[in-house]
């Protein structure tokens, strides 16, 4: 047999669909059926083929029904709704021969569903994935929000452009202990850490990082994408080691700080600029901006001095505030 025929025959043992573009393999024995979602939609015809050399005595069942769905090596089903998805199993004489799990990916009015994640609306509308980098090392963190707490599975893949999918490695998604309140509702926060393997911090980026997150809730499949340059998601850690030094014969103090440990080096090349503000109980003083790591301010009783940082030469996001008490 010709090698190409072998490949086609092997695939036909697993699953056939018409049209073939409407169904694809997510992982071994798990398939996504793409459906146009509207009233009286015809759905997709899916032909399941039992992965066995056996020919006779085969029956089919589904976890959605207690009845025998059919007999023979193949089973043809019409997938229109979630009740038609789920796990299909072929048996012979009480023995399980193979299983196939069908998930649904909905498209309404030409738009793929985004029901699983919450739109964070930052830095723009339809921002389901929020990615940040603390420096230019190629390491970044992406997070997302969901109101769903059970039957969830996430998988994240990333690359620099679409030419080399091995260029960026992402770990497993983890549930944060932090709950996020938005629109009068609490959401679970998930994060994932990614690292570009051959990152050069000083090099100009020509291709963006591409991130694809696949989400499965019960029998629903969705995917979310984000594309960015590392320079556009930079958010430094706050300055560290804030210190106050009283000035002689003056109501002012000198506040000093250091670059965060996580920031790229050398600092002479990767420079930060800083914002300093005195925050009292009832008001906030005017902000002071400096490229130095110290500043002179008037420190009122019961006030705090706070400092934040961002990239000096590229308008990155400002860091969170670091603060020290005046008292």
Swiss-Prot record:
Glycosylation (residues): 223
InterPro entries: FN3_dom, FN3_sf, Hematopoietin_rcpt_L_F3_CS, Ig-like_dom, Ig-like_dom_sf, Ig-like_fold, Ig_sub2, IL-12
GO annotation terms (biological process): positive regulation of mononuclear cell proliferation; type II interferon production
Localization per Swiss-Prot or TrEMBL: Secreted
Keyword Disulfide bond found: yes
Superkingdom of source: Eukaryota
Transmembrane segments: none
A GO term, aspect molecular function: cytokine receptor activity
Pfam families, per the entry: IL12p40_C
Ig-like C2-type domain ranges (all copies): 23-106
Keywords: Cytokine, Disulfide bond, Glycoprotein, Immunoglobulin domain, Secreted, Signal
Chief localisation class: secreted
Residues spanning the signal sequence: 1-22
PROSITE patterns referenced in this protein's UniProt entry, alphabetically: FN3, HEMATOPO_REC_L_F3, IG_LIKE
Domain Fibronectin type-III positions: 238-327
Record-level GO cellular component terms: extracellular space; interleukin-12 complex; membrane
Alphabetical list of SUPFAM superfamilies matching this protein: Fibronectin type III (SSF49265), Immunoglobulin (SSF48726)
Disulfide bond annotation, renumbered to this chain: 50-90
Function according to Swiss-Prot or TrEMBL: Cytokine that can act as a growth factor for activated T and NK cells, enhance the lytic activity of NK/lymphokine-activated killer cells, and stimulate the production of IFN-gamma by resting PBMC. Associates with IL23A to form the IL-23 interleukin, a heterodimeric cytokine which functions in innate and adaptive immunity. IL-23 may constitute with IL-17 an acute response to infection in peripheral tissues. IL-23 binds to a heterodimeric receptor complex composed of IL12RB1 and IL23R, activates the Jak-Stat signaling cascade, stimulates memory rather than naive T-cells and promotes production of pro-inflammatory cytokines. IL-23 induces autoimmune inflammation and thus may be responsible for autoimmune inflammatory diseases and may be important for tumorigenesis.
Subunit structure: Heterodimer with IL12A; disulfide-linked. The heterodimer is known as interleukin IL-12. Heterodimer with IL23A; disulfide-linked. The heterodimer is known as interleukin IL-23. Also secreted as a monomer. Interacts with NBR1; this interaction promotes IL-12 secretion.
Family: Belongs to the IL-12B family.
Name of the molecule in the record: Interleukin-12 subunit beta
Gene: IL12B
């Amino acid at each position: 047999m010709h090698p190409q025929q072998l490949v086609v025959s092997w695939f036909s043992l697993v699953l056939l669909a018409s049209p073939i573009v409407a169904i694809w393999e997510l992982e071994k024995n798990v398939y996504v059926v793409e459906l146009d979602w509207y009233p009286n939609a015809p759905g997709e015809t899916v032909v399941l083929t039992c992965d066995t050399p056996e020919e006779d005595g085969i029956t089919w069942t589904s976890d959605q029904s207690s009845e025998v769905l059919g007999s023979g090596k193949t089973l043809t089903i019409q997938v229109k709704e979630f009740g038609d998805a789920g796990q299909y199993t072929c048996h012979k004489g009480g023995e399980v021969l193979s299983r196939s799990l069908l998930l649904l990916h909905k498209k309404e009015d030409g738009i793929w569903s985004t029901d699983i994640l919450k739109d964070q609306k930052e830095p723009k509308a339809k921002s389901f994935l929020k990615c940040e980098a603390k420096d230019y090392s190629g390491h970044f963190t992406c997070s997302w929000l969901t109101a769903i707490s059970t039957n969830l599975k996430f998988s994240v893949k990333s690359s620099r452009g679409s030419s080399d999918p091995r260029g960026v490695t992402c770990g497993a998604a983890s549930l944060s202990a932090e709950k996020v309140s938005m629109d009068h509702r609490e959401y679970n926060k998930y994060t994932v850490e990614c690292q570009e393997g051959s990152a050069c911090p000083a090099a100009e980026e020509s291709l963006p990082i591409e991130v694809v997150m696949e989400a499965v809730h019960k029998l629903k499949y969705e995917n979310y994408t984000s594309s960015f340059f590392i320079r556009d998601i930079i958010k430094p850690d706050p300055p560290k080691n804030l210190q106050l030094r009283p000035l002689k014969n003056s109501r002012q103090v000198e506040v000093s700080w250091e670059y965060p440990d996580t920031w790229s080096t050398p600092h002479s090349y990767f420079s930060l600029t800083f914002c300093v503000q005195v925050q009292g109980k009832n008001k906030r003083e005017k902000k002071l901006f400096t490229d130095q790591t110290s500043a002179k301010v008037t420190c009122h009783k019961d006030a705090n001095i706070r400092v934040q940082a961002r990239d000096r030469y590229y308008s990155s996001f400002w860091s969170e505030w670091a603060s020290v008490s005046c008292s």
